[in-house]
A protein has these predicted regions:
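Solvent-exposed loop/turn segments flanking beta-strands in beta-repeat/beta-sandwich domains
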Residues: 44-57
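Recognizes extended acidic, P/S/T-rich segments that occur
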Residues: 54-102
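Extracellular fibronectin type III
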Residues: 112-135
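Beta-solenoid repeat scaffold
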Residues: 129-132, 137, 151-204, 217-218, ...
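Glycine-rich beta-solenoid repeat tracts in large extracellular/virion proteins
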Residues: 148, 165-172, 188-196, 209-215, ...
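Acidic, glycine- and Ser/Thr-rich low-complexity intrinsically disordered tracts
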Residues: 154, 260-270, 399-546
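Right-handed parallel beta-helix
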Residues: 159, 177, 181-186, 198-208, ...
Length: 546
């Protein structure tokens, strides 16, 4: 009997060790965008989740490698709170950020598991080129009667006038897009349908109604002025590899506390899409329920590798950016969000990683990050938030997990007892996050409180000073006077202009951030600064480029 027991224990130990060992599988680089690349490395095993993967990258033909952010460990899982239930595979996954368009890169991956299993691989992937007409494109003039006679490789310069409601019915080709362009902005449409089109670009027109992009591939909407209850829509089957950039999109909603929140009478979406590989950047969007939005539940196709970059967002009665149902490698970066109920929603993230980097948020009447419905895989880095109530508040009973929350600046503060849409902005803590999973990490964040004593709360643990706490070993408490001009939205019902939230060179957030390769390499002093900005550096462009 004793021998059998020993054998059983030995077999069990071997079995457990085998389950902890990592077996590398297939590597994919799905849906390259114009400036970012994704890597998905499927694995078997690693039940104890300690496998890591270092990343280096370089342009093809260059000698020197640059370090990337390590891939994130994504265990296989599912979300029982979605309809239908969504599942994801066991893998290491991540993004390489801010690359050159139309460029081939080598990505070197080094996998290591201390319990067994290691591999080194080099994969090649290319970013998409900027989606512009080719130099040898044929330029022709056109009016309403010419719209559906334009050929691939032609640019149709639209005459001024009223075009009514138009459905385009011709496709371009790879390298030969069809471009419809107004150089004056006076080609005016009641609405536009690009449904099921491929390689069609709409540029510089005015649309007093929706632009429909259902079923599109490689289509572009650029430098248009759109005024509508629903701006740009891409419902099932969604859009693939599209680009929506440099537009001004204005809705019908004002900054009205009576209609804020999920149950408010605030119907209307600025840019609402489903699909993968899309780039939504440098738009100015204001006056909607959700200014930028994914689709949810049964309305969502796979939403991977979508880039939401450098948008200027104002007056979102529910969410500034609704990144819900993002599956993996969606990137929400360098957006400015002002006067919204919620800044950014990830309700839920579906495995991830999904990245929220260097966004700036001011005057939010509920929360900065809505991580609900068991969101998984949110990576929240270098954001700046200034709001009445809790700086970072998350009050769900459906905890998020597998999140990395680092190098952020959260400023909360005194507020009245007012609620918005039935929800409170919080009591004024620097942070109040009530529930989160065992695989989350908070560290190197800075917290401040305006107009009341400092306090923070993580789970049931309340603290009145930093650093050296259980969940924030390197977090810091800072004063609210970090900026060149003292700013705080003490009246959330007021419509604020976006303030300058760059820190002073001598502020306590300077040089206090953790170094993260390919995320904060551009610091100019000893170390990166906490928050969205580096002190002394110009801010990025928000909204349409000159």
């Amino acid at each position: 009997m004793k021998l059998l027991t020993i054998l059983f224990l030995a077999i069990t130990a071997v079995s457990i060790h085998a389950a902890d060992r990592t077996t590398p599988g297939e590597i994919q680089t799905p849906y390259p965008t114009i400036t970012n690349l994704a890597v998905e490395w499927r694995i078997d095993g690693d039940d104890n989740l300690d496998a890591t993967c270092e990343v280096k990258f370089r342009k093809m033909g260059e000698l020197n490698w640059r370090k990337g952010m390590p891939l994130r460990r994504v265990p296989a899982g599912n979300n029982q709170a979605t309809n239908p239930i969504v599942s994801w595979t066991n893998r290491l996954s991540g993004s390489v950020f801010d690359l050159q368009p139309g460029t081939e890169y080598q990505i070197a991956l080094k996998l290591f598991d201390p319990h067994g299993g290691e591999a080194t691989k080099i994969v090649t992937a290319s970013t998409r080129p900027e989606p512009i007409a080719t130099k040898n494109a044929v330029i022709k003039s056109g009016s309403k009667t010419d719209l559906n006679s334009v050929q691939p490789g032609e640019v149709c310069i639209l005459a001024d006038g009223d075009y009514g409601a138009v459905s385009f019915n011709r496709d371009g080709e790879p390298g030969k897009p069809i471009v419809y362009r107004s150089t004056s902005g006076k080609a005016v449409f009641a609405e536009v349908s690009l449904t099921d089109r491929k390689w069609v670009y709409l540029e510089g027109v005015t649309v007093n109604g929706p632009v429909r992009m259902n079923g599109t591939e490689y289509c572009v909407v650029r430098r248009c002025t759109i005024s509508a209850k629903f701006g740009i829509k891409a419902y099932k089957p969604g859009m693939l590899n599209g680009c929506i950039e440099d537009n001004v999109i204005t809705g019908i909603r004002g900054w009205d506390p009576a209609i804020m929140g999920a149950s408010g009478d605030n119907d209307g979406e600025g840019i609402q899409i489903t699909g993968s590989g899309n780039v939504v950047r440098f738009n100015r969007v204001s006056g909607f329920r959700d200014c930028l939005s994914h689709m949810e539940d049964k309305d969502a196709m796979p939403q991977m590798c979508n880039d939401w970059l450098n948008n200027d967002i104002n007056i979102g009665l529910d969410d500034g950016i609704e990144a819900d149902f993002a599956m993996s490698n969606c990137r929400v970066m360098r957006n400015r969000i002002t006067n919204c109920f919620v800044g950014i929603s990830s309700q839920p993230g579906l495995g991830g990683p999904n990245y929220f980097i260097r966004n700036v948020m001011f005057n939010l009447t509920y929360s900065a990050f809505k991580l609900q419905r068991y969101s998984s895989g949110d990576v929240i880095l270098h954001n700046t938030v200034v709001k009445a109530g809790d700086g970072f508040g998350n009050y769900t009973s459906e905890p998020f997990d597998h999140s990395l929350i680092q190098n952020n600046l959260f400023i909360g503060g005194k507020t009245s007892d007012a609620t918005f849409g039935g929800y409170s902005p919080g009591r004024g803590r620097g942070v109040d996050v009530q529930q989160f999973g065992e695989h989350c990490r908070f560290d190197f964040n800075a917290y401040a409180v305006s107009g009341m004593p400092f306090e923070g709360k993580l789970r049931s643990w309340t603290f009145t000073k930093l650093p050296g706490t259980e969940f924030e070993p390197h977090g810091i408490q800072v004063g609210p006077d970090l900026f060149a001009t003292q700013v705080f939205p003490d009246n959330p019902t007021k419509l604020y202009s976006p303030p300058d939230l760059r820190p002073r060179l001598s502020s306590t957030v300077a040089d206090a951030a953790l170094r993260i390769s390919n995320v904060n390499d551009d610091f100019a002093t000893l170390s990166p600064d906490i928050g969205a900005y580096e002190a002394g550096q110009p801010p990025p462009i928000y909204g349409p480029r000159p």
